[in-house]
Amino acid sequence: MGDHYGFSLTTFSPSGKLMQIEYALNAVKNGQPSVGLRAKDGVVLATENVGSVLTDDQPKVEQISKHIGCVYSGMGPDFRILVKKARKIAMEYEMMYGEEMPTIQLVTDIAAVMQEYTQSGGVRPFGASLLIAGWDKNPGRPLLFQCDPSGAYFAWKATALGKNDVNAKTFLEKRFSEALELDDGIHTALLTLRESFDVGMNENNVEVAVCNSTGFHRLTKQQVHDHLGTL
């Protein structure tokens, strides 16, 4: 009977859980760590991306629209599907209304897609959680959200996903300040990421991006190298 609850997507267990969602969240917890931090003048996303020397780079940080981008922990193929859907949603909104989609509206639409995959036949939940960074022009503020496989979403000042996320969040609670500016935010995000790293951090296994009033930008390897040199 226990197997029935574990394999069924739409049947609650006696304890009130949908086990396939629990398993999807485990995929996130076993994923490479990611950190998001909201500074006064922008948002920082940082993540571990350890690949093979034999393969081309597979970025974990992706741009969705001019002022919105995201990073993930969990399963890469699932993330790429979500990014494709998010870009389509953002593009359709911009074509219809002639302006960039507000961050919160994109977050709610993507969360609705993820939730739909928890109660539909023939599919499974997405095995990835997203950290979505955005800058809304009106009233001109940075935003950071998390979307989970269940379809739940949260607004954060700072948070972490993936391996050792509890230690990373504890570190953020000690170091985060509302007064942080973007450069200090990058420094704090990298220090937090180091809490979860199994190997030495360098520009080849770390990705960093920022989102501010000028848009969403991925830092170059040289810029990442320079920031790591200040830790």
From Swiss-Prot:
Predominant location category: cytoplasm
Superkingdom as given in the UniProt entry: Eukaryota
Keywords associated with the record: Cytoplasm, Nucleus, Proteasome
PANTHER family: PROTEASOME SUBUNIT ALPHA/BETA
Protein name: Proteasome subunit alpha type-2
GO-annotated biological processes: proteasome-mediated ubiquitin-dependent protein catabolic process
Family of the protein in this entry: Belongs to the peptidase T1A family.
InterPro entries: Ntn_hydrolases_N (IPR029055), Proteasome_alpha (IPR050115), Proteasome_alpha-type (IPR023332), Proteasome_asu_N (IPR000426), Proteasome_sua/b (IPR001353)
Keyword Isomerase: no
Record note on quaternary structure: The 26S proteasome consists of a 20S proteasome core and two 19S regulatory subunits. The 20S proteasome core is composed of 28 subunits that are arranged in four stacked rings, resulting in a barrel-shaped structure. The two end rings are each formed by seven alpha subunits, and the two central rings are each formed by seven beta subunits. The catalytic chamber with the active sites is on the inside of the barrel.
